[in-house]
Amino acid sequence: MVKLANPLYTEWILEAIQKIKKQKQRPSEERICHAVSTSHGLDKKTVSEQLELSVQDGSVLKVTNKGLASYKDPDNPGRFSSVKPGTFPKSTKESRGSCNDLRNVDWNKLLRRAIEGLEEPNGSSLKNIEKYLRSQSDLTSTTNNPAFQQRLRLGAKRAVNNGRLLKDGPQYRVNYGSLDGKGAPQYPSAFPSSLPPVSLLPHEKDQPRADPIPICSFCLGTKESNREKKPEELLSCADCGSSGHPSCLKFCPELTTNVKALRWQCIECKTCSACRVQGRNADNMLFCDSCDRGFHMECCDPPLSRMPKGMWICQVCRPKKKGRKLLHEKAAQIKRRYAKPIGRPKNKLKQRLLSVTSDEGSMNAFTGRGSPDTEIKINIKQESADVNVIGNKDVVTEEDLDVFKQAQELSWEKIECESGVEDCGRYPSVIEFGKYEIQTWYSSPYPQEYARLPKLYLCEFCLKYMKSKNILLRHSKKCGWFHPPANEIYRRKDLSVFEVDGNMSKIYCQNLCLLAKLFLDHKTLYYDVEPFLFYVLTKNDEKGCHLVGYFSKEKLCQQKYNVSCIMIMPQHQRQGFGRFLIDFSYLLSRREGQAGSPEKPLSDLGRLSYLAYWKSVILEYLYHHHERHISIKAISRATGMCPHDIATTLQHLHMIDKRDGGFVIIRREKLILSHMEKLKTCSRANELDPDSLRWTPILISNAAVSEEEREAEKEAERLMEQASCWEKEEQEVLSTRANSRQSPAKVQSKNKYLHSPESRPVTGERGQLLELSKESSEEEEEEEEDEEEEDEEEEEEEEEDEEEEEEEEEEEEEEEEENIQSSPPRLTKPQSVAIKRKRPFVLKKKRGRKRRRINSSVTTETISETTEVLNEPFDNSDEERPMPQLEPTCEIEVEEDGRKPVLRKAFQHQPGKKRQTEEEEGKDNHCFKNADPCRNNMNDDSRNLKEGSKDNPEPLKCKQAWPKGTKRGLSKWRQNKERKTGFKLNLYTPPETPLEPDEQVTVEEQKETSEGKTSPTPISIEEEAKEAGEALLPQEENRRQETCAPVSPNTSPGEKPEDDLIKPEEEEEEEEEEEEEEGEEEEEEGGNVEKDPDGAKSQEKEEPEISPEKEDSARLDDHEEEEEEDEEPSHNEDHDADDEDDSHMESAEVEKEELPRESFKEVLENEEAFLDLNVQPSHSNPEVLMDCGVDLTASCNSEPKELAGDPEAVPESDEEPPPGEQAQKQDQKNSKEVDTEFKEGNPATMEIDSETVQAVQSLTQESSEQDDTFQDCAETQEACRSLQNYTRADQSPQIATTLDDCQQSDHSSPVSSVHSHPGQSVRSVNSPSVPALENSYAQISPDQSAISVPSLQNMETSPMMDVPSVSDHSQQVVDSGFSDLGSIESTTENYENPSSYDSTMGGSICGNGSSQNSCSYSNLTSSSLTQSSCAVTQQMSNISGSCSMLQQTSISSPPTCSVKSPQGCVVERPPSSSQQLAQCSMAANFTPPMQLAEIPETGNANIGLYERMGQSDFGAGHYPQPSATFSLAKLQQLTNTLIDHSLPYSHSAAVTSYANSASLSTPLSNTGLVQLSQSPHSVPGGPQAQATMTPPPNLTPPPMNLPPPLLQRNMAASNIGISHSQRLQTQIASKGHVSMRTKSASLSPAAATHQSQIYGRSQTVAMQGPARTLTMQRGMNMSVNLMPAPAYNVNSVNMNMNTLNAMNGYSMSQPMMNSGYHSNHGYMNQTPQYPMQMQMGMMGTQPYAQQPMQTPPHGNMMYTAPGHHGYMNTGMSKQSLNGSYMRR
């Protein structure tokens, strides 16, 4: 018959079907086409055609089930058919479908034949029966029938029903019915799975049986009743007929079953089955536990000399072959059962092999399976005996065994050992290591398959262990290592020492421990190597660095152990290397400035080695020091030995005596001189050269400090203590406020730390600094010790302290020393101390508490994770870690603290170039010593932080060093990092607690912004920080909230008395700053001011880390600290935001760092005014509070009246040429009070402090309120809901509400909190940023390309990046949603709380242009935005400003720009105006949509807006974008992703933005509306925006108030959670407007929209949101992206796009703006062009490509002029994003 289909193609199709079925999938047409096209390259269309033809041919079966077509191989229809097409004759095809040949088959006969042939004791499974039958050559015609398997199953089932077969589980056995000699047991269930089968022996078969006696000889019962009165079969003796119950005979069920099948004899009649002599030597007869046959012990095979213990099975039952045991037999059965590839049911290899007798066939069957050996084996098997095949009782044939032996011998040869492993007691007994073959001394816990080998092969460089020489040789060719994986810290001649971090090189260190255990008796550490540093000594030649030995030490050891384990390889022993390593460990201890000691207890060998070393060291010391007064302390200082060890050694040398109640050291000159003579005659082979050490300790202890230095330290300590008292007071207040986040003591200690460093500057050196405190205490000790007098003869030294100590082996002294060392002053980070010294030493103590972390016990540890880490001072160690002593250690080991990772990061950062910059800035930080200087420094710090963020690339190193830091509180660590690094995400944590006052959010945003600025390099850090921040953010947020809360109380009363408010805050800030200072000082001491900024960041990060860690446990303690941290970060953030904006504006790219400073100053100046303003209003009005915390926030939060008032302020700010100034103004408002104090300190301090204070205030204010209400995500969500409520209720009142009300709103609704953020955003970012952005972004705006790159760079590198509204906003967004999932939940609230997100968006929301256009708009908004498009934006801005965005108009607009809006940034760029116009036009369009004011319902309001808007365009198409659908996790994930890819961030954000745009679009649209709505919100100040905007006054006002910034944020992050419908609404709402807005604001606006939904304002945000969103994205750089992405989270795709958009710097936002404009398609297009250029410039090509992608989602979601928007949005959003990004 002619086939229609090509037979080759049919074969391919059948193969594909089999392949698909093997993968347990349904062979659908699509899968088949795909499989064939991938494997054979045939195009799918052809495959599809051939498949249809094959079906017509009948070559393929088509099966339709439930409307789905599947295809089957007619020859292999079932899953178990084992015949593969082509394996057997094609006869199968003819038999296809015809079962005629199966009708005459006797299935019972076949089944019985198979079961008996298989002879499986427990019965045979159907599968094995089938295999067996298929292997029978005479049954091929039957078995090849396709229906064979099915019919066989049916036959087996029927046979069981008929009683012919017995079924036990899956096993079938023949039911012989009577005991006729067949071996199959009758009672299958009783047959033991473990006992071998039994069968009659030849001589037993025809024996007569006696009639059974029906009574049990034991219990006299019958078969109806045994001893337990239960029926039981009787066993009867075949010879005498006496019977017994199995239970009476104590037979187990298995034995009973076997016995019933045999000829059983009772014990009297038992005959030996071997010799068959009855009654002979019955005492020596054994009874088989399987068949109960009897055997004489001498008749057994092999004969037995004594009775075996336990179960005994006779040779008859036992498998005969090779004496294989029962269990082996069982294993063989299992092997046999699974020998065939079950994975390939279609070709049962063994069966096929058995059926195919030719060698060729066998080989074919075996193709691809096993080695030729196996194939041959199978051939032999087949040819030798078919019967053997599947079911031999013995299963293993001779051939099998031979092959096995052969293979075993080969394998032994390969691993070069005899076939037996001699039992040497050590595993492995020999290792080959390099050119040495070394006998091991002890066993080591290598994996079993390696340890049991007689010889193990180790790579001498990477220490990997291998089984054979071959593997080693292969490995050595590939192994690229020639030295340990670490920094070389010592090199002299051919000796090097490497410092390997167990956390970074885990595998190497584990292998090193396993190797060491081979030569150490007592060693317990093998796998948990992360907390240890390994100092590996190598001998170097041309081949590499060969391992000589090593010692390990804990990074953070409470007991100051400097060695935990030490080992020298046997081939290098007795060459002085042990002494070398011991000496090296003490050298490190001396460098750390603290005494060290080996870990106790010592092993015998260790004791001998150490005692010899100690004796020589002390004798040499005494030889060189002939002073009359020799104290143990002096010896300790000189040698690094701990006093206890010195005392012990002196006792051993008999050189210590008790005289006159005191201890004296006796000089035994003979001993000393003899020792020195020996030394001269036999000089040491490998002497340690201290000058060759290139290593900086993390901790510097006081031991090495001179007396003067010690005195200085003492003085510093006293100062610190004083400061501590102040701090205590402050802390108590703050901690009370802070919900007892941190115990005052802890804060105190922190501050003390800071102070102590301050004081220490007196000492003047880093090392000395540390020692300052330590030495102060030590000094006292020493003074006591100095009292010791030495006799000239036996110069005796009396140590009053040491008298008792000495006797107690100086335990007391040791304790004293430890205390000293651990004492915070002592421990105060040496580096921090040093840095402080380097800095102008301002005795002015940090305002209330000196942050001195007093966990000195930790400090004791000197941990230098990496040399790099060591090199870096602990900028924020003090601040970050509560315990100074942990500093070095903390940094490395206490990463767990979360602080430490940051510290490390800081260290590593600090070394970077940024450090230089930061150093310059750090100089300001030097001022930190004083409260005012601290503030100054804080400003610098924030700048530095930004820069540090940039520097963070180095810190990233630290991260690398602490990949496992994650374990150690990575989250916290990351959080800290984020904070320090200016992670927006981190800062955004507050949004998580949306209710945090917007100020707080703003501050955080700013901080994040600043961090973000720094974060271009730190992006990876940011990513990590984001991850950490995700965990941390919520905590941070809570902390901040709490912090804010306390500050808020301060602020409320103190706002009017700025100084009062500022003072507590300032104090906190000062403390925070002090921490920063200390960190900075430390960094400076480290020698890098940059370190300082990094340090500040680190500190911030670390503190956040600590804070989160402590937060719950030590909330009281931490609260203040956290407050300080928060404040500091906040301030920094604020400042950073301002700086960033200023910087960006002033020098978008080039002067990022300098500009930030200038900006900072500008901002500070402005901020002082602004902060003051903000601070004052802050307490009075939510607006002000927000202002304080965040200008945007203030605006958003402020009630309409405040908004109205603030807008004036904001306009002032706007009018202020630089957005920085605007932000500054706002910052000043917030900061002014703080600034006043700062002013007291230094101008620089004031600058930074103003922001810090502002941030702190906002944080505290918000925190106080939010603290209560929004400590948890739940609270945050509640806040969101409240926001929604506020949206309706708070429309006008919200603005009107006092700060407290707003804050309450914050509490209840994130909106309020967002407001603060928007205010801050606006103020910090927008306001300052606008000018800065305009300057920086001026380029961006006009030529996106030009700006793109620089701007993007700036965005990433310069504070501006963070500064842009985006940064704040995005930080918040990212923080909330992205950095922390918790935050995201909160973010949901936050997102939903325009308040939270709108800190960025807020400005945007109200002043759509303001936020979106914020940078440009906001500024432009008031001025240029006002122009056509701008007009709307301005209106929106004004509305924003007047409404919740009060700040927006005046502050918000520019601030928004400055802080949050990349778009704003973009807009800020002069051309931005047009963009703004475009946006504005959108805003204008939005104006009508804004009428959707009725949207008051959060979600509904938005929808209403959108519906109204959309009624014309998208009216019906509200696509509820499942904003909320995005889980926080997803958001976080997205955020992380964004963070991970900063560049992609722009695009991603854009795309996501757009995608979300769809959903966000709606929200954005809504946001636009909301902005219009916000106008209503703004109603108090708001009609200004637009009547249309006002439509959802209710919605708008609350959302507006908080939402604008928060909205944007929330929208960005919250869009996810925000109303889907709302999003859709946005999309729908005003086709042009919404669409445009959506795209424009989509990212942030999405959040805004959500906010909008939640708050009418949110919609307002939409337009502004875009700018802001852009800003946010841009500011977020990473974080913003994430946030916006989260906003877009609503649509996962969108979210991704958002992420891209966010990366683009709010690409979405701009598109949203476009959306806004897109009502004006021209604008939209224009925007896209502009954004496109910008984006392209910024992101390179990505921007646009992504944007288009984004556009589709955007367009999709929006369905609003998707084309325009898509592109427009894409272009515009991207542009904005890019612009903001670039800035960043």
UniProtKB/Swiss-Prot annotation:
It catalyses: L-lysyl-[protein] + acetyl-CoA = N(6)-acetyl-L-lysyl-[protein] + CoA + H(+). Pfam families: MOZ_SAS (PF01853), PHD (PF00628), SAMD1_WH (PF21524), zf-MYST (PF17772). A zinc finger (PHD-type) spans 213-272, 269-320. Residues 1271-1784 are annotated as: Interaction with RUNX1 and RUNX2. Component of the MOZ/MORF complex composed at least of ING5, KAT6A, KAT6B, MEAF6 and one of BRPF1, BRD1/BRPF2 and BRPF3. Interacts with RUNX1 and RUNX2. Belongs to the MYST (SAS/MOZ) family. This is Histone acetyltransferase KAT6B. It comes from Macaca fascicularis (Crab-eating macaque).
